[in-house]
Amino acid sequence: MVLMIVSGRSGSGKSVALRALEDMGFYCVDNLPVVLLPDLAHSLAERNMSAAVSIDVRNMPESPEVFENALTSLPDSFSPQLLFLDADRNTLIRRYSDTRRLHPLSSKNLSLESAIDEENVLLEPLRSRADLIIDTSEMSVHELAEMLRTRLLGKRERELTMVFESFGFKHGIPIDADYVFDVRFLPNPHWDPKLRPMTGLDRPVAAFLDRHTEVHNFIYQTRSYLELWLPMLETNNRSYLTVAIGCTGGKHRSVYIAEQLADYFRSRGKNVQSRHRTLEKRRS
């Protein structure tokens, strides 16, 4: 069974995540004090039910030791996982402006911007311990719920999930990436007028890139690097490894290479997911 601890800055989507987890069969509790986590887990162990609990600045423990003690007191049948949601500063400000809700730290006579910044500092101990960090800045409510369903229901218990994610540098680097590889130096299909409207998922673009030795060398050396360190990453008690591949616009080279790497590790029996940030943004 899983004890999913959901944390993140206010406005990043914790309520949406809890609703999605509840739809997946989790017993969900909003803002449960950390010291009560073992009691909740023991009561649900008898019912063989996974749980999801949100933690934010309102119920943060006074010290990291309190959090660690609570986790070590869980029944052996429970596997704790920490999901941290985040969004960039401007997105959080816009969301608060749209909903006109008060920030949890507004009672300290802070401006909204200062409250968001202070919350970021207070939550850093949880963020640094997270098994999975999701940046919701460019996600709709539906997209966040769908991502959680895909990642959680598509994951075999206690197995590392490799996520290969393409992106465009002009749109920013994904903050949830464990590794970032820059492929802007590779031949660019964008300069071929016939290939420009296509993506790295289309065969003509794939054929163009496949003709270049440097593309093959990059894929080979990148997968060799990942294969070298993957055994240690798998034994490091982590749930996800997110590998981000970036080109200029996130449309051709990064998409193709992310798919090639995903296919390779999938063929080796690894649990693999792929995501293309720019293409998904264009479809939304």
UniProtKB/Swiss-Prot annotation:
Q: Which cysteines are joined by disulfide bonds?
A: none
* Entry keyword set: ATP-binding, GTP-binding, Nucleotide-binding, RNA-binding
What's the short name of a Pfam family annotated to this entry?
PapZ_C
**Annotated residues for binding of GTP:** 56-59
User: Its domain of life?
Assistant: Bacteria
Q: Which GO terms describe its molecular function?
A: ATP binding; GTP binding; RNA binding
InterPro entries (alphabetical): P-loop_NTPase, RapZ-like, RapZ-like_N, RapZ_C
**SUPFAM superfamilies named in the record:** P-loop containing nucleoside triphosphate hydrolases
Q: Please tell me where ATP binds in this chain.
A: 8-15
Q: Which stretches does the entry tag as region RNA-binding?
A: 266-284
Task: Show the HAMAP family listed in the entry.
Answer: RapZ_like
Q: Which family does it belong to?
A: Belongs to the RapZ-like family. RapZ subfamily.
Quaternary structure, per UniProt, is: Homotrimer.
Any idea what job this protein has?
Modulates the synthesis of GlmS, by affecting the processing and stability of the regulatory small RNA GlmZ. When glucosamine-6-phosphate (GlcN6P) concentrations are high in the cell, RapZ binds GlmZ and targets it to cleavage by RNase E. Consequently, GlmZ is inactivated and unable to activate GlmS synthesis. Under low GlcN6P concentrations, RapZ is sequestered and inactivated by an other regulatory small RNA, GlmY, preventing GlmZ degradation and leading to synthesis of GlmS.
The protein's name = RNase adapter protein RapZ
Look up and give the organism this protein is from: Erwinia tasmaniensis (strain DSM 17950 / CFBP 7177 / CIP 109463 / NCPPB 4357 / Et1/99)
